[in-house]
Amino acid sequence: SGGGKTHLALELLKYLCGFVDRAAYDTLEQGLSLSFQNAWKNAAMQEVGSRVIVLAKEPIKELRERLRKRKSPNVIVIDSITALVGFTRTVFMELINEFPDKLFIFIAHEENNKPYPAIAQHVRKLSEVKIRVEGYKGFVTTRFKGEKGEGGADFVIWEQGANEYWIDKL
């Protein structure tokens, strides 16, 4: 909590809006709280206009109904798995199998350097790209080949926060 996950997800979503017509951010954990509104402003999400819809704590059942409609979002951020009640391996597999042409970005917390809750570990194992966030840095792991220019590089989410966090850890 407080390491930059939401900000990173918003920045990534803003970037992906350059390639898709519609995207959705399901803010299950924070809802439309002041902290989420501040993260939205800090990521300058107004730049994407109406291409991103914010879903305030929309459960998976309703999200699936939304995604079945014409002109539904192409990219969906779920923030976070921790706040998803009843999200099981079966529900996850049904979701990604029903919508194979959608890009899902799942956010999870960590306990002992592992995704939490347990379903988050399963989601991570099946993901093409994983970004572990710690101390305002994103550490990328991917199934793509970095030497072919397909992978991704680690990056700083917030320079001042990262500098303060990592100064004693290096």
Predicted feature residues:
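Conserved P-loop
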Residues: 1-61
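Active-site-adjacent loop/helix micro-motif of nuclease/hydrolase catalytic cores
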Residues: 4-8, 85-90, 115-116
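Short, ordered loop/turn segments at secondary-structure junctions
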Residues: 28-30, 81-82, 109-110
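Alpha-helical scaffold elements adjacent to nucleotide-binding pockets in ATP/GTP-utilizing enzyme cores
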Residues: 35-39, 91-94, 122-126
